[in-house]
């Protein structure tokens, strides 16, 4: 009798464990969670950029290999002649794709007095390309642009927009 109860107990608990494994199989759990986190990117011992946020979830353990940043997200990009700062409420970095998505109160400012605001912005880090399908505002020392779509290099020297309004200075 004891042997039958023991076998029944093992059978029930093993089935219960298997069902928990099956239930949790598709659940995506971050590899780590950090507060007040900063990630630095270097090239040949030179700091090229860093990204920070109040909360960071690392999902590099997933096939998509991404990180999420929440609250006061800031990406600072250093060049030889200028620095660019991108701020937002939320960002997701797709590490293997070399791609960043910014959402909520996105602001770009540069040391060349350029600024851009949007509700959403995508940044291709490999090609240094910015784009959005949302409304945005861009301004520099001589131009002020409001438009519905942006497709531009990070220096704003090759800028394509949709439904443009505002003022642009054109030189001959």
Positions of the model-derived regions?
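Mature-chain termini and adjacent capping regions
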Residues: 1-172
